[in-house]
């Protein structure tokens, strides 16, 4: 009997935590709708996202953190989603952008190659590659070549 009571107490705590989590998530969404991204990002930083498996929720938080200019937090959330196989090509593209923004070119190149494989006929692979090479201070001639390849492929 005592064990049963402890189980109920634990479940009540879990439900309260879930309830509080949902309240904070709604706060974040309302702040984001009002374009108050910094405040929304601060609330998001205080929350534990490790159990969240919903792509839509994680995408919202990634977008909030990006809009607030916190690329490291946005990158970390995107990695969390990536490791759960959420988001598909769009997430890989976004994660590559975050790695570029935080000057992690090794990971950016690896993800770019993955994106290019998945997106063989997608115009965005040229744009992403251009952004990557430009951030790496590639010579102008190489950047022009990338743009010409883009133009030749998508006239």
Show the residue positions of the predicted features.
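Structural motif corresponding to the intra-repeat A-B loop/turn of tetratricopeptide repeats
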Residues: 34, 68, 102, 136-140
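Alpha-solenoid helical repeat scaffolds
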Residues: 25-26, 56-60, 90-94, 124-131
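Short coil turns that delineate tetratricopeptide repeat
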Residues: 18, 52, 86, 120-121, ...
């Amino acid at each position: 009997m005592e064990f049963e009571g402890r189980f109920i107490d634990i479940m009540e705590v879990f439900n309260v935590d879930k309830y509080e989590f949902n309240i904070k998530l709604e706060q974040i969404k309302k702040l984001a709708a009002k374009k108050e991204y910094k405040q929304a990002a601060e609330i998001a930083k205080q929350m534990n996202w490790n159990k969240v498996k919903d792509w839509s929720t994680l995408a919202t938080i990634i977008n909030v953190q990006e809009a607030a200019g916190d690329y490291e937090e946005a990158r970390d959330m995107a990695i969390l989603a990536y490791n759960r196989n959420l988001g598909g090509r769009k997430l890989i593209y976004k994660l590559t952008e975050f790695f570029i923004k935080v000057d992690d070119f090794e990971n950016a190149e690896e993800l770019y190659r993955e994106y290019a494989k998945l997106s063989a006929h997608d115009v965005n692979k040229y744009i992403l590659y251009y952004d990557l090479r430009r951030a790496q201070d590639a010579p102008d001639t190489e950047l022009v070549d990338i743009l010409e390849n883009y133009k030749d492929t998508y006239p």
